[in-house]
Amino acid sequence: MSAIESVMQEHRVFNPPEGFASQAAIPSMEAYQALCDEAERDYEGFWARHARELLHWTKPFTKVLDQSNAPFYKWFEDGELNASYNCLDRNLQNGNADKVAIVFEADDGSVTRVTYRELHGKVCRFANGLKALGIRKGDRVVIYMPMSVEGVVAMQACARLGATHSVVFGGFSAKSLQERLVDVGAVALITADEQMRGGKALPLKAIADDALALGGCEAVRNVIVYRRTGGKVAWTEGRDRWMEDVSAGQPDTCEAEPVSAEHPLFVLYTSGSTGKPKGVQHSTGGYLLWALMTMKWTFDIKPDDLFWCTADIGWVTGHTYIAYGPLAAGATQVVFEGVPTYPNAGRFWDMIARHKVSIFYTAPTAIRSLIKAAEADEKIHPKQYDLSSLRLLGTVGEPINPEAWMWYYKNIGNERCPIVDTFWQTETGGHMITPLPGATPLVPGSCTLPLPGIMAAIVDETGHDVPNGNGGILVVKRPWPAMIRTIWGDPERFRKSYFPEELGGKLYLAGDGSIRDKDTGYFTIMGRIDDVLNVSGHRMGTMEIESALVSNPLVAEAAVVGRPDDMTGEAICAFVVLKRSRPTGEEAVKIATELRNWVGKEIGPIAKPKDIRFGDNLPKTRSGKIMRRLLRSLAKGEEITQDTSTLENPAILEQLKQAQ
């Protein structure tokens, strides 16, 4: 395999602020290395120590790791615990009962505060109500809800009973919801009348009804509806129930059902490259352990922090760093219903200032769109807001290009907040490669080093290690407690997708291209393996070309894909959003030429995009991820046949199609 070539030359280094390091959970690179050494010396002992110290077990485990049926690994299997008990009851016992657990801000700006005692009561009453409806340990419950306290309550109530939840993002279509209901074998669906996004009401209950009408969901005996807006909804007597009625009159306590550490806490569906979505199955013990460890290590969570992860509970980030991790850590967190651009694009900065957020965790896509908004309107520039409460920033969901990193560092963190650029996946359960804010010298665009206990490596297509400085395929060499256990109902697909025989069947395949710096050993993620371009025999990660484009002062956002080319094998096609209005005609030709030359100067002639198309924005999911598969189809001139139900802005496809 020809090495994936990294053309990013990033030499800026930012050390942890002294005051931060001295108070941090991991205060130095020496402390980081000591933990890595402990894991190398005694891998099972390392994980067992943390599991015993950090979690409450109703039955202590005696066996740490079972590898007898690899790659179907089992951790702490003979131990028993309950995730909801660890998140809620322990906080009632350790003095946090009257501490605020959730500061909920609705789309319209109204704020509700819920203490740990109140949250525990809500969860227990709802869990008792579910039990009264016949929902038991091992049942699967699908949750299709807006961002809300009630969404977290629904997840925690399922965990309390030992019912496996499967949260479906509120932006998914009826067909997508139906597929997940059928695949997971749900016995109940928890939804809402409507959800609010950017001042608009979206009809969740109507979509849920349509999903159930598509058939195959006969096992769903109960549809429980959270009354979010009071909007009118269709009603099926005997099946549909209001959430408040399910909880009404139920006791404030509900015994937490002990489950095996390997009991499925949840199944979360993620897109497959082909075929139906993959139901990623996570365990209870190993998953919860890593959620809590990464809250302590990556976010350095302290008792007086106000933590805000802007994700949706429909994605894994919202599971680990809203519904479970912060509660297990006894933290106070913001939960937000709305969008970053309503009522204007200063919403995030306004909320940080009003609530005095200290740790802020968001996606690079959101940062890039807010850069564009801030530069277009001085009134909503971050400098207009008091962001002095912040002490730590984070990014999640995709690699962050160095220019966006620097803007975030300067304008949001005021050059005093470390940035944890976290690489992880739905399948990994929690962070894998990330800076530690009190220890790691930061390099813009690099997720730096694996967390202690995570044996990440870069290999070629035969599974052999490649030297630092050469690109390759990111893998993890040893199992870890929070890893995916299987694909729900499809163990063979799990084995082929994540432990392919081509790599020897024992390496976890992350599916991303990566490179390690020759000197520091730092990892840079170069995009999905299928986002690697091969132009005239040169293999390049799309992220690097995107970073070069975005570093041009005219460019707000860029996405790069490949298309077949008779001469070069593959040609580079760039979709670009400018900081000003979209150019057309002669002006578009002129700016495209400028940008080609810019990339040639930044990277080299081989990286010049053959095609550049300008749009008002890029096709994105409602969670803000760029839908690159649609861009690939556009670049190739193909008709769009893929599912576009999660697309936030469908009209952009026609605009980009016409832009060629």
Swiss-Prot record:
Residues involved in ATP binding: G397, E398, P399, D421, T422, F423, W424, Q425, T426, D512, R528, R539
Official protein name in the record: Acetyl-coenzyme A synthetase
Membrane-spanning ranges: none
Keyword list, A-Z: Acetylation, ATP-binding, Ligase, Magnesium, Metal-binding, Nucleotide-binding
GO molecular function: acetate-CoA ligase activity; AMP binding; ATP binding; metal ion binding
Gene3D superfamilies: 3.30.300.30, N-terminal domain of ligase-like
Residues that coordinate or bind Mg(2+): V550, V555
Cofactor(s) named in the record: Mg(2+)
GO cellular component: cytosol
UniProt pathway: Ketone degradation; acetoin degradation
Keyword rRNA processing: no
